[in-house]
Amino acid sequence: MSGFTHTAPECISIEASGDLSTKQYLFVDVNSDGQVAVETSAGAAVVGVLQDKPSAQGRPACVMLSGVSQVVAGAAFDAGARVTVDTAGKAQEATSGQYIHGTALKAATAADDRVAILLQLNSGQVA
């Protein structure tokens, strides 16, 4: 993430829905039990990006709501792309009818790259 710093981030702690130890930097949402889980519906609304690795249900999960966060890419996209969530909780370029969750500050050259995203959660839908 050279060239960028995490300025004025806003994180909250929410109970994990299960073992999220391999889900760091994925988009998450709150389930019907009030716990955080990886979002698996492409283009859906999210609550934020998981910042840590909670290892069991009920453990606190740090979720970033605003600022600049690393996010795992689900596919390649350019810097400046408006991104949304894919079916694995990763970032992908938003298409028609999908919620925009941020702007890529760096390009993702392949799936599973970690890139800096300026979070703008649920900021609108692509027309």
Which functions belong to the PLM regions below?
Residues 1-127:
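Surface-exposed, low-hydrophobicity beta-strand/loop segments enriched in small/polar/acidic residues
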